[in-house]
């Protein structure tokens, strides 16, 4: 039986989902969050759909064993690859992430938006469906951005090599006249200051973190699973990679010291 005081489970290929964790912590602070970073296999963007599906099911099974009341997939690639399988297999709520095409279409004034996306998302049926539903009246420039996640997984948010990559990915979008850029990975939210600097003040950056936090709050409320107001949510972190290194990176990205446990089975 699910109880309102149970934690919310989250997972991602690595640390990108922490950007969503921050939004959840801000929007619904009473909720406890158990987070799994599959850092040993990051990034998922170059993995097969079968791998992402199976890995999502494995991690969700672990989180179920920890007594979670809901699952948040803190990854665009993870959502594309495993959300359907998780919703079919689990009885608890599953909240996924999709690129913020709809709000970007609403925000653009030039009628041209850009989307920085992982390679796996760029060609996905899910993105194509979003473009069909919301992007028919605007021009959408899809820009796959391989190589960024590795920098973020190392807590490198402004190094010279990273800056060159970001400039190379963003410049064609600016030349095409975009005034709105979708951050199509939870990882890329940590690069918001750098991307904003490269894109300039006239370009709006949009991500899905706040919307995911709102959706989670809505789903928990509908199921009468919301943590009691006034309670203080806690956090636990696991990684399939090196716990010491993950603790360093997660602490740097969250701006506070955390401890990380080794995910059983890796």
Residue ranges and their predicted role:
Residues 1-266:
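Non-catalytic structural scaffold of enzyme domains
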């Amino acid at each position: 039986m699910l109880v309102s005081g149970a934690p919310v489970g989250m997972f991602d290929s690595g640390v990108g989902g922490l950007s969503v964790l921050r939004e959840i912590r801000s929007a619904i602070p009473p909720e406890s969050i158990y987070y799994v970073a599959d850092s040993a296999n990051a990034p998922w963007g170059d993995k097969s759909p079968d791998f992402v599906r199976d890995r999502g099911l494995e991690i969700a099974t672990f989180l179920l064993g920890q007594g979670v009341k809901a699952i948040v997939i803190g990854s665009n690639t993870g959502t594309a690859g495993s959300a359907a399988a998780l919703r079919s297999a689990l009885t608890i709520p599953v909240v996924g992430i999709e690129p913020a095409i709809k709000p970007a279409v609403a925000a653009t004034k030039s009628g041209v938006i850009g989307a920085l996306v992982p390679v796996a998302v760029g060609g996905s049926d899910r993105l194509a469906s979003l473009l069909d539903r919301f992007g028919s009246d605007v021009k959408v420039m899809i820009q796959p951005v391989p190589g960024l996640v590795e920098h973020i997984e190392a807590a490198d948010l402004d190094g010279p090599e990273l800056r060159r990559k970001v400039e190379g990915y963003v410049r064609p979008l600016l030349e095409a006249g975009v005034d709105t850029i979708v951050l199509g990975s939870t990882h890329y939210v940590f690069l918001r200051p750098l991307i904003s600097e490269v894109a300039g003040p006239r370009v709006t950056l949009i991500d899905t973190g706040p919307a995911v936090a709102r959706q989670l709050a809505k789903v928990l409320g509908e199921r009468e699973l919301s943590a009691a107001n006034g309670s203080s949510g806690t956090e636990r972190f696991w990684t399939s990679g090196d716990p010491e290194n993950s603790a360093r990176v997660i602490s740097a990205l969250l701006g506070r010291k955390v401890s990380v446990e080794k995910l059983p089975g890796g």
